[in-house]
């Protein structure tokens, strides 16, 4: 995938200050091409960390993928939507349907510019994404919206797989577990990196 990404563009949605973009750069050897974030302070930090990236200080929903990419093929589209309204760390606090629904923007990209690979990272509870009862997740419909999201990607011709991974198994100094989803439409298999640290 690395060689092909020199001929395709890489897009980081919900780019924040550039953590995911830095990881992508470490993996593929170059900066991401486009970074999108609604927060001016986050985009300012991203610009400082990734000065060669094209920046959009807008809501991910306000970006037209066709215009932003300018007809260039998209090799990788990365999504790290706000996780606070899924995380168990939030406790019993109310959740916001609009924030929980941010991941749907991945379908907008899939439908308009068809990235070869889509990756999404979030808290492990993301796979329990379901409808709300008032301002709380409906305990009887855990995972229903997540399944709809996955099926929508599949209807767009994507093969989809997901896993929960621990950062410490890949050399990061934290034991937290994160959810990762990979979707690809190029007919090639989804391959997960093998752990590099810890017990075999």
What does each of the following model-derived ranges do?
Residues 35, 54-56, 76-80, 87:
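Short, conserved beta-strand segments within well-ordered enzyme catalytic domains
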Residues 4, 47, 54, 67-68, ...:
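A general structural signal for stabilizing positions within well-ordered secondary structure
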Residues 10, 35, 78, 119-120:
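Generic enzyme active-site microenvironment
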């Amino acid at each position: 995938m690395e060689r092909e990404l020199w001929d395709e563009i890489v897009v980081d949605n919900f780019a924040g200050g550039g953590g995911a973009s830095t990881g992508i750069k470490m993996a593929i050897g170059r900066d991401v091409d486009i970074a999108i974030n609604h927060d001016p302070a986050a985009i300012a930090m991203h610009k400082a960390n990734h000065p060669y990236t094209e920046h959009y200080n807008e809501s991910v929903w306000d970006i037209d993928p066709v215009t932003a990419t300018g007809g260039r093929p998209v090799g990788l589209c990365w999504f790290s939507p706000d996780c606070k309204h899924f995380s168990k760390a939030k406790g019993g606090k109310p959740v916001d349907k609009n924030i929980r629904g941010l991941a749907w923007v991945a379908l907008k990209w899939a439908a308009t510019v068809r990235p070869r690979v889509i990756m999404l990272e979030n808290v492990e509870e993301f796979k329990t994404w379901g409808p709300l009862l008032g301002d709380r997740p409906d305990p009887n419909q855990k995972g229903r919206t997540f399944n709809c999201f996955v099926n929508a990607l599949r209807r767009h011709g994507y093969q989809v797989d997901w896993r929960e991974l621990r950062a410490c198994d890949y050399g990061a100094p934290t034991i937290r577990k994160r959810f990762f989803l990979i979707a690809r439409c190029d007919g090639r298999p989804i391959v997960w990196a093998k752990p590099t640290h810890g017990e075999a």
